Amino acid sequence: MESYVMSCKYAEPQFPPCEEDYSNFSDQGGYYNNPQDSGSYGGGYQSVQPPPPPYAPQQSSYHPRSVQEQHREDAEERAQHPAASFPGYREVDASGKQGYSAGDLQCQAWMTCAKSPQVQRKVVCHGKDKSPIVVYPWMKKVHVAQVNPNHPGPEPKRLRTAYTRQQVLELEKEFHFSRYLTRRRRVEVAHTLCLSERQVKVWFQNRRMRWKKDHKLPNTKGRSKNKKTTDSNNNNSGGATSVKAAITV
């Protein structure tokens, strides 16, 4: 930890060379010095070397200080050099600008280099001005004629809708798959082509009539009318014949 600063007055303690003392061990009665255990071998074990002299501590120049004095000196050094004890500390100059240390600059450079090229490319792309969205003519809702509400006199007739080529192409695709649209699909098509639901409905009605005409199919409306007229004629003819038969009888 860099926050802990060692005092310059601290002297490393000096100790004498380490020597093993076996005097206490022999007094306690070790395994080899016990005559009772080694009696079967013809006598106790006698040490060849004399025991070493007792340890006498030497006087050294090191005088241990109290913990409070050491903490006090550390606090004074931290107050004099705050940047050494706190790496992230930034000194503020008189002008108000912060001075960044070399470690902070290296950290910022590493973070910029660590980014992948894809992330850097995205940042650059977001910074540029976005290109304007292209609006094609068929996307503009200008095909519906507006009726002037302040027009004097009777209400004018509804004007025809001028469908664009793109709208007609999309409607033809829908008609190719299904000649009858559901309500949900009709709303989706109207929203996609910037049309009203009624305009899509009318276009499909007209397209079905043209399709029947091209395939020479009888008109359902005309056939129902003709059926009604034929039924009425048959009824009238049947009533006339019954009246004639009654007169002849």
Swiss-Prot record:
Instruction: Enumerate the SUPFAM superfamilies for this protein.
Output: Homeodomain-like
Return the Basic and acidic residues bias intervals: 66-80
Q: Which GO terms describe its biological process?
A: anterior/posterior pattern specification; embryonic skeletal system morphogenesis; positive regulation of transcription by RNA polymerase II
Q: Which Pfam families match?
A: Homeodomain
Keywords of the record: Developmental protein, DNA-binding, Homeobox, Nucleus, Transcription, Transcription regulation
Q: Name one GO molecular function term.
A: RNA polymerase II cis-regulatory region sequence-specific DNA binding
User: Sorted alphabetically, which InterPro entries does this protein's record hold?
Assistant: Antp_homeobox_Deformed_sf, HD, HD_metazoa, Homeobox_antennapedia, Homeobox_Antennapedia_CS, Homeobox_CS, Homeodomain-like_sf
Q: Name one GO cellular component term.
A: nucleoplasm
Stretch list, region Disordered: 13-92, 213-249
Give compartment(s): Nucleus
Keyword Flavoprotein listed: no
Q: Which PANTHER family match?
A: HOMEOBOX C5, HOMEOTIC PROTEIN DEFORMED
Q: What is this protein called?
A: Homeobox protein Hox-D4b
